[in-house]
Structure formats: structure tokens, C-alpha cells
Amino acid sequence: MAVQKSKKSRSRRGMRRSHDAVTPENLSVDPVSGETHRRHHITADGFYKGVKVIAV
């Protein structure tokens, strides 16, 4: 099993963890139905960029 040569400081630990934060999802409002959805994803009723792309 690998063992570190020396203890990592709180600063190094924090710098490593700086990329672990969870960011909130970006939401958009569909121009046709006014429904809120995730960016670059179709809405629950099958619209994407105001065009019906899938029959639901």
C-alpha cells in the first residue's frame, strides 16, 4: 500500500479540494411553453429551442 513521505498541509488539502464544489444547475425558460428546464436539454413536454423534437 502506498504511504506518503510527508504530511500534506491544510493549504494543500484545500487547494486539492477547490475543484470539488457542487455548482447549481443552469436553468432556462422555454419560449413556447414557459416551462423551466436545464440548459441544452429538452423540456418535459418534448420541446427544444421552441421546436417540438420528440412526441411525449
Curated annotation (Swiss-Prot):
UniProt-listed SUPFAM superfamilies: Zn-binding ribosomal proteins (SSF57829)
Biased composition (Basic residues): 1-16
Entry GO CC: large ribosomal subunit
A Pfam entry, by short name: Ribosomal_L32p
Any one GO BP annotation for this protein: translation
Superkingdom classification of source: Bacteria
Residue span of region Disordered: 1-38
Keyword Ribonucleoprotein: yes
A Gene Ontology molecular function term of the record: structural constituent of ribosome
Keywords, alphabetical: Ribonucleoprotein, Ribosomal protein
Family of this protein: Belongs to the bacterial ribosomal protein bL32 family.
Name of the protein this chain belongs to: Large ribosomal subunit protein bL32
Source organism: Colwellia psychrerythraea (strain 34H / ATCC BAA-681) (Vibrio psychroerythus)
Lineage: Bacteria, Pseudomonadati, Pseudomonadota, Gammaproteobacteria, Alteromonadales
